[in-house]
Amino acid sequence: MISGIQRLPEKSEAVLRPTKAARRMIMKNRENDKVYKLVLTALMAALCYVAFTFLKIPIPTPGGDTTALHIGNAFCVLAALLLGGGYGGVAGSLGMTIADLLDPVYITSAPKTFILKLCIGLIAGFVAHKIAHITEDHDSRYIMKWSLIASVAGLGFNVVMDPIVGYFYKNYILGVESSAAKIMATWAAGATLVNAIVGTIVVVVVYMAVRPVLKKAGLFMKIK
């Protein structure tokens, strides 16, 4: 005894210390979680690619450019809701950028796409997980409300920034004449708004349908 404080018996201390087997199990679970996240990130990137490449409606614009109606951005947001802003943003940016790189019409937009889609995921993920904590136990009304708000935040950012970034990118990086770049940006803004409205509906409907299925299967991840 030292100053009235008794030291626990060695056997008791041994019980309190995690065993090597327990530590290995914890590390293995962490590795499994990481692998699952990477697999799901790749899956969401593939869905973004497919949604843009095969489910888009191209719209030629004055000045020789082309914009499109598509739901690729919806999967960027859905990835952020399921995986968090970081992994979700990477999934969206990779999937959509690869789609641009493999399409001669959109290949010059790839750098812009990578940045904007990453931001969509980061913003939607921040609202969903840092503000609303939607992966915790809440009623369906709360989940629907905040998945809607997160979608509006991420896709709303894109509605504002896509034409602005697109204008400067085409004008200063690609060397497109200012007046032509403005016309292209205006057309792109209209298509981006339609995509955002449709995308928001898709995100909320799909997330509300997929969430209980993943929970029942034990595959739903809680994002802190």
Name each model feature, range by range.
Residues 2-8, 12-224:
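Loop-helix junctions at membrane interfaces
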